Curated annotation (Swiss-Prot):
Record flagged with keyword Metal-binding: no
Keyword terms: Bacterial microcompartment, Calvin cycle, Carbon dioxide fixation, Carboxysome, Photorespiration, Photosynthesis
Record's subcellular location: Carboxysome
CDD domains: RuBisCO_small
Taxonomy of the source species: Bacteria, Bacillati, Cyanobacteriota, Cyanophyceae, Synechococcales
Function according to Swiss-Prot or TrEMBL: RuBisCO catalyzes two reactions: the carboxylation of D-ribulose 1,5-bisphosphate, the primary event in carbon dioxide fixation, as well as the oxidative fragmentation of the pentose substrate in the photorespiration process. Both reactions occur simultaneously and in competition at the same active site.
Name assigned to this protein: Ribulose bisphosphate carboxylase small subunit
GO cellular component: carboxysome
Entry-linked Pfam families: RuBisCO_small
């Protein structure tokens, strides 16, 4: 059995070991968040160091969001304005008062 060496890229999260997610795959993740009752929000940052806890929020969390398409539209808008930044979608649980899900949907120089 031969082992494959991964390219020397910085890994950020579980999904970073996969090829970049398509809009359809991102929509499926967002749909899961909405079904769980989490409020989606979009954040961006110039760097994606694991030590950086504070990202800039893109607008306000989408509290009234009912469809993944609404979030995808905001992701596209954020990509067009901050294409040189990392962009992630996060899910906020207002009962536990914490972020429960987050994944990167855009890496600079990738799309």
């Amino acid at each position: 059995m031969s082992m494959k060496t991964l390219p020397k890229e910085r890994r950020f999260e579980t999904f970073s070991y996969l090829p970049p997610l398509s809009d359809r795959q991102i929509a499926a993740q967002i749909e899961y968040m909405i079904e769980q009752g989490f409020h989606p929000l979009i954040e961006f940052n110039e760097h994606s160091n694991p030590e950086e806890f504070y990202w800039t929020m893109w607008k306000l969390p989408l509290f009234d969001c009912k469809s993944p398409q609404q979030v995808l539209d905001e992701v596209r808008e954020c990509r067009s304005e901050y294409g040189d930044c990392y962009i992630r979608v996060a899910g906020f649980d207002n009962i536990k008062q914490c972020q429960t899900v987050s994944f990167i949907v855009h890496r600079p120089g990738r799309y």
